[in-house]
Design a protein with these regions (language model features):
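Outer-membrane beta-barrel "beta-signal"
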Residues: 220-232
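Outer membrane beta-barrel
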Residues: 1-75, 93-97, 148, 155-178
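C-terminal/domain-terminus segments
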Residues: 70-84, 214-220
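Detector for outer-membrane/organellar transmembrane beta-barrel domains
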Residues: 64-65, 83, 87-189
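Transmembrane beta-barrel domains of bacterial outer-membrane proteins
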Residues: 9, 20, 25, 29, ...
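Extracellular low-complexity, Gly/Ser/Thr-rich intrinsically disordered linkers
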Residues: 187-203, 207-213, 229-232
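Transmembrane beta-barrel strands of outer-membrane/channel proteins
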Residues: 16-20, 70-74, 103-107, 134-138, ...
Length: 232
């Protein structure tokens, strides 16, 4: 786990941290609450930089729902070193009473290459408590081959209150899809969960998921997980 320190600087909010995400102060327009480590990023897989390391960032709230944030993260052995894999990102967001929109952009160093990613996210909340969230990310890889220089990720999820808890389901790409020989693969993941409080201090969230095989000869993977959260 990482450690971070957040503090005000004028009208802005600033953070510094170790083993934290550079996107810690980003506002990603997604209200989906699934517990898996694949679809919970709402397709903001790379633009919302989450590689850990030494991180810094700042956010500013303009009021009326508009915010802007920026972040950077560096490997443990160096900061802004030409030989290190650093990442820089910016996030713009608008949040209203029943919907939100956000745009995230990142430049991620990969050795001597500089890859860029752009993520678009949005959600809408109905009066009955039902929420729909969606996201799409596209990337441009700094490689010599024009047939393998793009990435994609997408997501759509729905969630809302059912009984004492929250029911949700989503589908999307299982991580980032990378172009190969001019063809973008499509490996989808599906999941459904129900999160409910056992008592005032404990919440249990069972989830079932399926990940499609990466090829015709690769079998689909189906599994179940249970997340237990405690609060004191």
């Amino acid at each position: 786990d990482g450690i971070s320190y957040t503090f005000p600087l004028g009208d802005a909010t600033v953070f510094v941290g170790d083993n934290t995400d550079g996107s810690m102060l980003f506002t990603t327009a997604c209200v989906y609450g699934g517990p898996s480590n694949s679809l919970d990023d709402c397709a903001n897989v790379n633009a919302g930089i989450t590689g850990g390391g030494v991180s810094v960032g700042a956010a500013y709230d303009f009021g009326s729902g508009f915010t802007i944030a920026g972040g950077a993260q560096f490997v443990e052995t160096g900061i802004a070193d030409k030989e290190e894999d650093d990442a820089y990102a910016v996030n713009l967001a608008y949040t209203a009473d029943s919907y939100g929109l956000s745009l995230s952009y990142a430049n991620v160093e990969d050795g001597v290459d500089n890859d860029t990613y752009t993520a678009l996210n949005g959600y809408y909340s109905f009066d009955n408590g039902l929420n729909i969230s969606a996201g799409f990310e596209f990337g441009s890889l700094d490689v010599s081959s024009a047939d393998a220089d793009e990435t994609e990720a997408f997501f759509i999820g729905i969630n809302g209150e059912v009984g004492p808890g929250e029911l949700g389901a989503a589908l999307g790409t299982a991580g980032t899809m990378t172009e190969a020989s001019g063809v973008m693969p499509e490996q989808l993941m599906y999941e459904a969960y129900y999160s409910y409080p056992v008592n005032d201090g404990m919440t249990i969230t069972p989830l079932i998921y399926t990940v499609e095989g990466s090829s015709a000869s690769d079998m689909d993977e189906t599994g179940v997980m249970v997340k237990t959260s405690f609060s004191f």
